[in-house]
């Protein structure tokens, strides 16, 4: 009953605070665990908000989705700032327990990959890293095969009298989105007449906020990893900083960036 509820019970603090299980006796390992567990909690909330935004936009309720999208970008800012905390760990601190991590890596975060899928950055090759976790794999497959945030945003363009090719509206959503000159032209009309298309204009800018924040997070990730391990390979088998740096050019909403050159 509500009158019996306590702060600790409501937040399941006993379970939450016992979930940090360092494998070594090194002081800094707890920070490493807390940073990554906190990231996963924030990703859970981000996925919750993106799911709401997807539902609202797909149903034509674009303006109510702004709040969810704004909340996501605020959370992204907090996640980016958290790299500064991890950066207090020196190379010696990290190397003192790195071997205990084995092949575990943030590269294997299914929630981060689900977020990429829901934004429109689809890549089926990541599914193979989650075959031993059926629930995580099912979540990823659902996100992969469903329309992304960008797909439902593009679908709003014809509802406002803008021309979009059928191939952009009815496609295999599990495949990587290929930028379209026609889609860019439609968004360009929105940006050239924001008063007329205010709802779409605001939606587009909210999406760019998300993309901007994601790239900023990636960039800070690269710098933090380089500061701590330099050019060493990542624990997950990637080439570490080299792989992370290669992701900096990714854009979830490509035409919303490219159109700016033509304004």
Curated annotation (Swiss-Prot):
| InterPro entries for the chain | Trp/Indoleamine_2_3_dOase-like, Trp_2_3_dOase
Q: Give me the residues that bind substrate, please.
A: 32-36, 94, 98, 235
Identify which top EC class this enzyme belongs to: oxidoreductase
Q: In which pathway does it act?
A: Amino-acid degradation; L-tryptophan degradation via kynurenine pathway; L-kynurenine from L-tryptophan: step 1/2
- Highest taxon of the lineage: Bacteria
- The EC designation for this entry is 1.13.11.11
Catalytic activity of the protein: L-tryptophan + O2 = N-formyl-L-kynurenine
Binding of heme, residues: 221
Which GO annotations describe the biological process of this protein? L-tryptophan catabolic process to acetyl-CoA; L-tryptophan catabolic process to kynurenine
Q: Which cofactor does it need?
A: heme
GO MF annotations, alphabetized:
heme binding; metal ion binding; tryptophan 2,3-dioxygenase activity
Question: Per UniProt, which keywords does this protein have?
Answer: Dioxygenase, Heme, Iron, Metal-binding, Oxidoreductase, Tryptophan catabolism
Cofactor: binding comment: Binds 1 heme group per subunit.
Family from the record = Belongs to the tryptophan 2,3-dioxygenase family.
Q: How does it assemble?
A: Homotetramer.
What is the purpose of this protein? Heme-dependent dioxygenase that catalyzes the oxidative cleavage of the L-tryptophan (L-Trp) pyrrole ring and converts L-tryptophan to N-formyl-L-kynurenine. Catalyzes the oxidative cleavage of the indole moiety.
- Name assigned to this protein: Tryptophan 2,3-dioxygenase
């Amino acid at each position: 009953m509500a009158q019996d509820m306590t702060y600790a019970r409501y937040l399941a603090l006993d379970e939450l605070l016992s979930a940090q299980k360092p494998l070594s006796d090194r002081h800094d390992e707890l920070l490493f665990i807390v940073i990554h567990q906190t990231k996963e909690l924030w990703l859970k909330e981000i996925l919750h908000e993106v799911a709401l935004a997807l539902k609202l936009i797909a149903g034509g309720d674009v303006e109510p989705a702004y709040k969810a999208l704004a909340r996501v970008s605020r959370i992204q800012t907090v996640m980016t700032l958290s790299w500064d905390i991890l950066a207090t760990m020196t190379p010696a601190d990290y190397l003192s327990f790195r071997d205990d991590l084995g092949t575990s890596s943030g590269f294997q975060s299914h929630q981060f990959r689900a977020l990429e899928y829901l934004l429109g950055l689809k890549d089926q090759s990541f599914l193979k890293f989650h075959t031993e976790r059926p629930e995580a794999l099912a979540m990823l497959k659902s996100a992969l095969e469903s329309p992304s945030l960008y797909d439902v945003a593009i679908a709003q363009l014809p509802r406002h009298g803008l021309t979009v090719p059928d191939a952009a509206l009815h496609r295999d959503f599990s495949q990587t989105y290929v930028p379209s000159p026609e889609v860019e032209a439609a968004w360009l009309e929105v940006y050239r007449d924001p008063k007329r298309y205010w709802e779409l204009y605001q939606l587009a800018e909210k999406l760019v906020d998300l993309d901007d924040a994601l790239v900023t997070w990636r960039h800070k990730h690269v710098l933090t990893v380089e500061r701590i391990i330099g050019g060493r390979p990542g624990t997950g088998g990637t080439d570490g900083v080299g792989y992370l740096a290669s992701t900096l050019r990714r854009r979830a909403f490509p035409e919303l960036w490219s159109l700016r050159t033509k304004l």
